[in-house]
């Protein structure tokens, strides 16, 4: 009997040793990295004058806007008539000013979704849409189609979550919110969350030739894995567009002007016209002007001195242009192993680890090799991720390769913020029509320990 017991113990131990690594070591997203923010602040080599430009831009980026500019602590002008936020820094906040959506689970600055309180700020009478929650991401909403007399037509545009109706600085305005309940019932609403702005001056300073050469350098291996990729381009001159979820914006100035217009309702030199009905227009248009007298700023508590410097839109672009890229965490044995696996399974074929800038006007930003982990091309991601919106050459299921620098401290993932779990975000790439499907198959074939190493690597970025 004793000999049988010993044999049974040996057999059981051998069985546990055989299955142990798969069952005991369950892979999981480590979560957003703690400690100091690995991003924020100006690019380290900038000269004193360039640092001043950045600091002025930062002030404008953090400014809170109201309709009139006369509300206490809301000195910016031009909010509305429809809007999603009242400050650039409100949406771009994690892990530091210029980042992605804030949230309650931030190790750096835990805050609820600011859009919830914004709905009724200063007397506004908005209802909070059901897709905006205290513990969820900041979102914008777009309608896939719009109803016309002949049926339906493509839409794809941003529909502001809120209006200025009821606000103390918007007397007489009576503008209804979009009927989100009806459109949600039609499955006609898609969402997007803020993209981080860190290091975008380096991205802007990378030539089209460099981007095309980078994509060509992996063509053979990509072809074997079913990865194609193309660049979204400007319809006039054919140059590569690279900013936004679908790489739909050609320049940081256009990116900035669009953000002011569709997110805050502020008309500007790039988008000069209001987007809502008459009766709710309280300011001259455009409301943000570049290099000329700006009466709106003069009435906003500047002592009558009209602003003659760069507009807020130009300052936004300068902020993104001069902000330093994210700094990764110190490497560990696990993250180093994960970096090798990232290359082995093919993640790096789209998430290119490094690119090099061309000549730059800014000190220390010429011929710089940087690590965005993106090819800035758009790829078919399949209908599981498709938003059914076309922007330029980017079709309904195509998205720009999301840069992974800074992903270690990000709270929400994918274009619509549908998950806070990095592992779920990776596996969501496994759609039937997705170019990443074979890469995800190889990822899923890794051992749990290897998957954990890869996750640890990503959270170190």
Predicted features along the sequence, with ranges:
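Bacterial N-terminal signal peptides
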Residues: 8-18
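Positively charged n-region of N-terminal signal peptides that target proteins for export
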Residues: 1-4
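Periplasmic c-type cytochrome electron-transfer domains
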Residues: 23-461
